[in-house]
Amino acid sequence: MNKKEVISYSGFSMMPPESVELLENNKGRVVINENEKIVDVPDYKILSFWDRIEQLGIWKWKKKYNSKYEILDGYQWQLKLRNRKGEAKHIEGHESYPKNFKDLIKELNILFGTKIEF
């Protein structure tokens, strides 16, 4: 039995939050600059995304990435993943990132047709 897939990312700083989320029936919710839209997410893109997640080693990322300095503002982000096999990961950070974080953002942009900047 396949588990419900979860692909959810949100990030924010001083600007309104940006977020993407996989919904049921190959749809995705994109919220950029307080504008929400529903987009089509073809199955082949979802499968390709999971391949890239594996290649990038995201399953091995730590659960938390926080700056060693106390920062009152700054960029905060959260990633929630669960693939069709049931593998799951919840990761969050505040002004600290894994080394290939930009690659994750690139893959999310490909999957959802967005232009999240980092």
Briefly describe each language-model feature range.
Residues 12-18:
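Short, thiol/selenol-centered motifs that function as redox-active sites or metal-ligating centers
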Residues 26, 53-54:
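Short amphipathic alpha-helical segments, especially helix-boundary/capping motifs
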Residues 19-38:
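Short, flexible N-terminal segments of the mature chain
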Residues 1-12, 37-48, 52-53, 59-118:
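Short, well-ordered, aromatic-rich surface patches in folded extracellular/luminal domains
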